């Protein structure tokens, strides 16, 4: 029996990503922009009801909740050909429409005001599921709504549904060129909630997305649409084994359990290959896609969707490759042997050094130019360099108490700035834990003789 997942899209970024993701899911399941199953979509074998449910008139509706504090992006969705796909009762735009002013504290306070409206939608979706497995949250952590309101909702979802999984797709800001001056504050405050209240966080680093888009598309500055197509391809591929199930990894808990051996280190990187013009406008083609070729490309640092600082000690904690297409399992076995012989992947010294592979069939309704494609979900210690970058940027602002007044206007910061210090400490502990994973005695980390209690 399929276990349903409710998607919560927050803010400008979350709703832009979500809109393209649902277009992609509709295409992969033979569902029209109005939610009607196409006459030619007769293949079966897919599980639509993990992410969709059927209305009384049989058309398919995403199990999605769209929330924003300003109306522009949701208005665009409602003016698009997919306007009738969504349940109008599951769309929330703040009445004053003023947004969160790129301020985490404003977004968080807005959460307290609109909590009941949003929770009513979430409860309705949860109750409409036969066997809810969990939530997927799409957001950015740089601005106000995705980071602040996102933080508030993560806390509440965790309180209200303690046994349900929460997987986030979180866009981290581009370190080089952020358009929000206070993004180091917003990001760190949101990161604390991602550490404490999410079971798994797929890290999408804007800097890396821009670099991969530029590399694949031959353009200096890729458009928002192109970057969102990139992201939606990755999100759709990461849910492929839930929608086209095989023997393993056919529910969220199976995927998370195989990737996250210790609870705090749950920040995952992704690589995908090949990106082609089927998915992204103007993508250059890759001629050859054997299983070995795809698996080798997935391990190349330049294909990772997180910009990390190279380090000799960095290593994989776990890898899950989701390979799509008509693939012979012997090819997979041979490819894994070749990768091991050439030592293309460096693993932690205290755990199993193996690449897990999930084979999944591809949607019969989407034609592609390539035989095999692959997504890698990896837990890698070099993600610590992303947290280090965030800490350094935060410290630079905090040292001067720059822009603090904007935060003090909100209730949470009215009596002091402990929340900032607490968020910084959480990030620092996370950084230390990922670094500790690189040493053989990590197993005693956090014990009486370890670094933390």
UniProtKB/Swiss-Prot annotation:
Keywords: Cytoplasm, Cytoskeleton, GTP-binding, Microtubule, Nucleotide-binding
SMART domains, A to Z: Tubulin, Tubulin_C
Places the protein is found: Cytoplasm, Cytoskeleton, Microtubule organizing center, Spindle pole body
Residues passing through the membrane, by range: none
InterPro entries: Gamma_tubulin, Tub_FtsZ_C, Tubulin, Tubulin/FtsZ-like_C, Tubulin/FtsZ_2-layer-sand-dom, Tubulin/FtsZ_GTPase_sf, Tubulin_C, Tubulin_CS
Chief site of localization: cytoplasm
Keyword Nucleotide-binding recorded: yes
SUPFAM superfamilies from the UniProt entry: Tubulin C-terminal domain-like (SSF55307), Tubulin nucleotide-binding domain-like (SSF52490)
Pfam families membership: Tubulin (PF00091), Tubulin_C (PF03953)
GO molecular-function terms, A-Z: GTP binding
GO biological process, one term: cytoplasmic microtubule organization
GO cellular component: cytoplasm; gamma-tubulin complex; microtubule; spindle pole body
Binding residues for GTP: 142-148
Function text: Tubulin is the major constituent of microtubules. The gamma chain is found at microtubule organizing centers (MTOC) such as the spindle poles or the centrosome, suggesting that it is involved in the minus-end nucleation of microtubule assembly.
Family: Belongs to the tubulin family.
PANTHER family: TUBULIN
Listed name of the protein: Tubulin gamma chain
Organism: Coprinopsis cinerea (strain Okayama-7 / 130 / ATCC MYA-4618 / FGSC 9003)
């Amino acid at each position: 029996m399929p276990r349903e997942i409710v998607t919560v899209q927050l803010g400008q970024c979350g709703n832009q990503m979500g809109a393209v993701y649902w277009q992609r899911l509709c295409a992969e399941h033979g569902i029209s922009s109005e939610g009607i199953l196409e006459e030619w979509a007769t293949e079966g074998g897919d599980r639509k009801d993990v992410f969709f449910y059927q209305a009384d008139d049989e058309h398919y509706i995403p199990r999605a909740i769209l929330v924003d504090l300003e109306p522009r992006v949701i208005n665009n969705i409602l003016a698009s050909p997919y306007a009738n796909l969504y349940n109008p009762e599951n769309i929330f735009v703040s009445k004053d429409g003023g947004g969160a002013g790129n301020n985490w504290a404003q977004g968080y306070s807005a959460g307290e005001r609109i909590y009941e409206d949003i929770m009513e939608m979430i409860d309705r979706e949860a109750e409409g599921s036969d066997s809810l497995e969990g939530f997927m949250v799409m957001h950015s952590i740089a601005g106000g709504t995705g980071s602040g309101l996102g933080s508030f909702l993560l806390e509440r979802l965790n309180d209200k549904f303690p046994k349900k999984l929460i997987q986030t797709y979180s866009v981290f800001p581009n370190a080089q060129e952020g358009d929000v001056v206070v993004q180091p504050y917003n990001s760190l405050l949101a990161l604390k909630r991602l550490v404490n209240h999410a079971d798994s966080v797929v890290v999408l680093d804007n800097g890396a997305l821009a670099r991969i888009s530029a590399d694949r598309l031959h353009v200096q500055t890729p458009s928002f649409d192109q970057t969102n197509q990139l992201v939606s391809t990755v999100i759709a591929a990461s849910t492929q084994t839930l929608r086209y199930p095989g023997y393993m990894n056919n529910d969220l808990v199976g995927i998370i359990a195989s990737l996250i051996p210790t609870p705090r280190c749950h920040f995952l990187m992704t690589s995908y290959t090949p990106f082609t013009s089927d998915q992204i406008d103007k993508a250059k083609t890759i001629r050859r896609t054997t299983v070995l070729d795809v698996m080798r490309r997935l391990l190349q640092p330049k294909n990772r969707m997180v910009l990390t600082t190279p380090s000799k000690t960095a290593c994989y904690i776990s890898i899950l490759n989701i390979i799509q297409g008509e693939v012979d399992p012997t090819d997979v076995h041979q490819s894994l042997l070749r990768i091991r012989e050439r030592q293309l992947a460096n693993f932690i010294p205290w755990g199993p050094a193996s690449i897990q592979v999930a084979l999944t069939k591809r949607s019969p309704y989407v034609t592609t130019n390539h035989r095999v494609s692959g997504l890698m979900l990896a837990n890698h210690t070099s993600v610590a360099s992303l947290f280090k970058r965030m800490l350094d940027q935060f410290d630079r602002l905090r040292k001067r108490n720059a822009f603090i007044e904007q935060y003090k206007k909100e209730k949470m910061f009215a009596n002091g700035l402990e929340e900032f210090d607490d968020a910084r400490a959480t990030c620092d502990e996370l950084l230390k834990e990922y670094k500790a994973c690189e040493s053989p005695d990590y197993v005693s980390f956090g014990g009486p003789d370890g670094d933390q209690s």
